[in-house]
């Protein structure tokens, strides 16, 4: 299955937070996968960041630390699947909603379609042209 791409900011512009580029890929990916507002997702991650750092850090504006995003997702029923040695194009995400983790970036994939602000399906760092897939989060239904 070939992944397709659709540009999406996860509702950031609609939330009145502008369109400036910032390290907000985790916020955007979670907002899309959870089908909740960007502002609500950002507030939840900021609260967790503040709690986990004892107040030393207050905002995920310039990137969300991995322990914070991992806890946020696992607390909401997501399970991490590690995919060592595979590439994004090696996986079939048809009929699934996942948050894919590639080097230095996270993206939402809904039914085989990457929803992101840029076409993150491509990489110039690999021979196959697809980024390495470190793992992905998928919600487990109870």
Mark where each language-model region is.
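Contiguous, function-dense segments enriched for cysteine-driven chemistry
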Residues: 1-14, 84-88, 93, 132
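Noncatalytic regulatory segments and standalone regulatory/sensor domains
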Residues: 116-142
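Polar low-complexity intrinsically disordered regions enriched in Ser/Thr and small residues
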Residues: 13-14, 57-58, 66, 132, ...
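Intrinsic disorder/low-structure terminal segments
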Residues: 4, 71, 135-136
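Active-site nucleophile-adjacent alpha helix/oxyanion-hole segment immediately C-terminal to the catalytic cysteine
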Residues: 1-60, 76
């Amino acid at each position: 299955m070939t992944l397709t791409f659709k540009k999406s900011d996860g509702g950031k512009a609609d939330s009145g937070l502008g369109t400036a580029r910032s390290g907000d890929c985790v916020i955007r990916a979670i907002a899309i996968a959870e089908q909740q507002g960007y502002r609500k997702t950002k507030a939840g991650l900021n609260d967790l960041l503040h709690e986990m750092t004892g107040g030393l850090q207050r905002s995920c504006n310039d990137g969300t630390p991995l322990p914070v995003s991992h806890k946020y997702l696992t607390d909401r029923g997501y399970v991490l699947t590690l995919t060592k040695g595979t590439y994004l194009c090696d996986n079939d995400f048809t009929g699934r909603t996942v948050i894919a983790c590639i080097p230095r970036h996270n993206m939402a994939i809904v039914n085989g379609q990457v929803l992101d602000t840029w076409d993150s399906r491509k990489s110039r760092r690999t021979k196959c042209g697809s980024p390495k897939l470190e793992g992905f989060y998928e919600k487990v239904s109870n």
